[in-house]
């Protein structure tokens, strides 16, 4: 069974346009079937993750993608590079970075706005658990659309986030037993001074899904969660 690892958006502008949304190149490292490397001028962190972290289908609500696009995850289309290991026993690991590389800032310098994610994961046919460390530099705020206004106003600070994810699904689809995806994020900000500034924020997500209930490829889902606050 394929796991959804993307989200489609509709363009509603009035002018004709042709643009490249994502582009990258992935190659094995040496002759290895377990190690790979990715580089691209337009890529997001999660395309380079070691494993899919959620089986809840986001539908119309992108905030529920990847078990909640909150502290550690979020839209991040920039220049990126990463490495990934996927073992035969279910263990997988990845480390990748995307950088805005704005003019004069350089790559991974103190002035550069970048996001570096490292994941450890264990996945079997029916379940998955993972932990991701996200190091965000120079006011990176890809979490902003799933957070309270107070969290978004993080005063040009660096941040460190952790994302725990897990899912489980029954052996057979189309039954009354739902598949379940859960997520919990915590993010802490460096340098936020003053009593009205957020030092730490958390979020959570729970999604239940019933695939193939009436016919193949249909889906019934219920998802709820708390934005970063």
Give the ranges of each region predicted by the language model.
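Extracellular loop and loop/strand-boundary signature of outer-membrane beta-barrel proteins
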Residues: 8-11, 65-69, 103-106, 147-153, ...
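Active-site substrate-binding loop specific to GH73 endo-beta-N-acetylglucosaminidase modules
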Residues: 115
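Detector for outer-membrane/organellar transmembrane beta-barrel domains
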Residues: 89-90, 94, 111, 121-229
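Charged, low-complexity surface patches
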Residues: 14, 109-110
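Outer membrane beta-barrel
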Residues: 1-102, 121-125, 205-229
């Amino acid at each position: 069974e394929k796991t959804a690892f993307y989200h489609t958006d509709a363009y509603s502008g009035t002018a004709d346009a042709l643009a490249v949304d994502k582009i990258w190149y992935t190659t094995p490292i040496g002759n290895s079937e377990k190690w790979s490397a990715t580089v691209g001028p337009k890529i997001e962190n999660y395309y380079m993750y070691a494993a899919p972290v959620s089986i809840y289908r986001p539908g119309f609500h992108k905030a529920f993608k990847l078990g909640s696009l909150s502290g550690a995850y979020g839209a991040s289309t920039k220049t990126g590079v990463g490495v990934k290991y996927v073992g035969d026993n279910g263990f997988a690991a990845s480390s990748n970075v995307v950088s805005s590389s704005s003019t004069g800032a350089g790559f991974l310098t103190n002035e550069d706005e970048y996001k570096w994610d490292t994941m450890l994961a264990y996945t079997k046919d029916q379940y998955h658990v993972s932990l991701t460390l996200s190091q965000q530099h120079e006011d990176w705020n890809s979490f902003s659309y799933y957070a309270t206004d107070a969290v978004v106003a993080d005063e040009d600070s660096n941040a460190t986030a952790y994302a725990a994810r897990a899912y489980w699904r029954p052996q057979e689809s189309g039954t009354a037993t739902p598949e379940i995806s859960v997520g919990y994020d915590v993010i802490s900000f460096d340098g936020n001074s003053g009593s009205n500034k957020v030092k730490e924020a958390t979020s959570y997500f729970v999604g239940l899904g019933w695939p193939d209930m009436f016919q193949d490829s249909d889906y019934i889902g219920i998802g709820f969660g708390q934005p970063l606050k």
